[in-house]
Curated annotation (Swiss-Prot):
It comes from the Bacteria. It is found in: Cytoplasm. Its EC number is 6.1.1.17. Its main location: cytoplasm. NCBIfam families: gltX_bact. The keyword Glycosyltransferase does not apply. A motif ('HIGH' region) lies at residues 9-19. This is Glutamate--tRNA ligase.
Length: 464
């Protein structure tokens, strides 16, 4: 058997971080088992689903690097209405579905009664049964189609995350599978899609647990082999509440990109939300695929920890090739009015500073003074700069100007003799020198910084 999983987002605005975690686990499960990971766009909400929202999903999947095996044949539910109608007709013909002519008022009265009695909402008055007389069909009413849910027994499955789950069928409604206008409903479309796509493992959020018995009963009615189900726990915000834009939480995956998070780091972090492999915190996706097993997924909700996310991101920045980092940092430098990054070469700058940043935006800031001297803070000036320091910088500039070989080692060799002559410690040279050349007291080793900036530019800045 070839393992087939799917990710089935609804294009109604943005790609949610919880959805990406679901996609990641489905993707990793398929890759671990040498199977297929498929993408389906559940766009039957015609009022909210837009082409722009579809592109947001596709772009988000591309950004995080979750490749799907039906890239040339993504399933769109709106293109499958004929297929859904075909299956509904088959269910009607077999007696596994029926027409219901209840009005909104009748359904509301049933709902209120069911709430009081704790029973299923719909009283099944239009459900055909042996010896039962159905009401007279009202004139001018377009019926919905309901699925004939079994009245006795239980629907149960062994959830790959939550374990044994059993739901009495008497607690389930005869759910609507086609609306009065003929459009199919969510729970029905999902079943037909999973069946036609050959999905063997449905891995999704645990907000779908209540849908599962309904879908299992429909799958049985159409003669399908049941997939296995695994329901993932929610991701909560740092306060332990549901992630929400209204609460100020970052929810869209593209927003994390704007925050300077690498896609590899984002996936690494999301993998650790609800899943563990010993004490391993930092790993590649190749390792994750090798290690991943749904039995290691906790059924309890996970909580966001932005501090941990940034730490993991910093670790990934350290191992990212400088050339790749340069392509990611250049646009951020352009936003900071730095467009020329040849002298010094940005890759060389990144090699020196990338272990000082936990996100790409901070990394871009760390590169600025290599190209343009920054304005020092008042605190740095008060602490490290005075007339004596200014005069000392001019004297040291003469030593720098006399260097024939401009490199880190040659610059470093000037420090001790100069400090001895001036009767000062290195801090009295290094900190003012950083301010004079870079405009900040926080830089890597100053000899390496000067070597990269270049002799002509260093002397110009000191003497400005």
């Amino acid at each position: 058997m070839t393992v087939k999983t799917r990710f089935a987002p609804s294009p109604t605005g943005y790609l949610h971080i919880g959805g990406v975690r679901t996609a990641l686990f489905s993707w990793a499960f398929a890759r671990h088992h040498k199977g297929e990971f498929l993408l389906r766009i559940e766009d039957t909400d015609l009022a909210r689903s837009t082409a722009e929202s579809v592109n947001i999903i596709l772009d988000g999947m591309k950004w995080v690097g979750l490749d799907y095996d039906n890239a040339g044949n993504v399933v769109y539910q709106t293109r499958r209405f004929d297929r859904y109608k075909e299956v509904i007709a088959e269910l009607l013909e077999k007696g596994d579905a029926y027409y219901c002519y209840c009005s909104k008022e009748e359904l509301e009265a049933m709902r209120e009664k069911a709430e009081k009695e704790g029973t299923a909402t719909y009283d099944r008055r239009w459900r055909p049964e042996a010896g039962k007389t159905l009401p007279e069909i009202p004139a001018g009413v377009q019926p919905v189609v309901r699925f004939k849910t079994p009245l006795d027994g239980v629907t149960k499955w062994t959830d790959l995350v939550k374990g044994e789950i059993s739901i009495p069928n008497e607690a389930l409604d005869d759910l609507i599978i086609a609306r009065a206008d003929g459009t199919p409903t969510y729970n029905f479309c999902v079943v037909v899609d999973d069946y036609d796509m050959g999905v063997t493992h449905v891995i999704r959020g645990d907000d779908h647990v209540n849908n599962t018995p309904k879908q299992i009963n429909i799958l049985k009615a159409i003669g399908a082999t049941l997939p296995e189900y695994g329901h993932l726990p929610m991701i909560l915000n740092e306060q332990g509440k549901k992630i929400s834009k209204r609460s100020g939480d970052t929810v869209a995956i593209t927003d994390f990109g704007a925050m300077g998070i690498l896609p590899e780091a984002m996936l690494n972090y999301l993998a650790r939300l609800g899943w563990a492999h010993g004490d391993d915190e930092f790993f590649t996706m190749e390792q994750f695929i090798e290690w991943f097993d749904l039995k290691d997924v906790s059924p309890s909700p996970s909580r966001m920890d932005l501090k941990k996310l940034y730490w993991i991101n910093g670790e990934h920045i350290k191992i990212t090739p400088n050339g790749k980092l340069a392509e990611l940092v250049k646009p951020r430098l352009a936003l900071r009015d730095i467009h020329e990054t040849e002298k010094p070469a940005l890759e060389d700058v990144l090699a020196l500073v990338k272990d000082r940043a936990q996100d790409l935006n901070t990394l871009a800031d760390e590169c600025l003074y290599f190209y343009v001297k920054q304005t020092p803070t008042e605190a740095d000036v008060q602490k490290h700069w005075d007339d004596e320091a200014a005069a000392r910088m001019l004297r040291f500039a003469e030593r720098l100007e006399g260097l024939e070989d401009w490199n880190t080692e040659a610059i470093h060799d000037l420090f001790k003799p100069f400090c001895d002559e001036e009767g000062i410690k290195m801090g009295k040279l290094g900190m003012p020198l950083r301010l004079a050349v870079c405009g900040t007291a926080k830089t890597p080793s100053v000899d390496a910084v000067l070597a990269l900036i270049g002799k002509e530019e260093v002397l110009k800045r000191i003497r400005a």
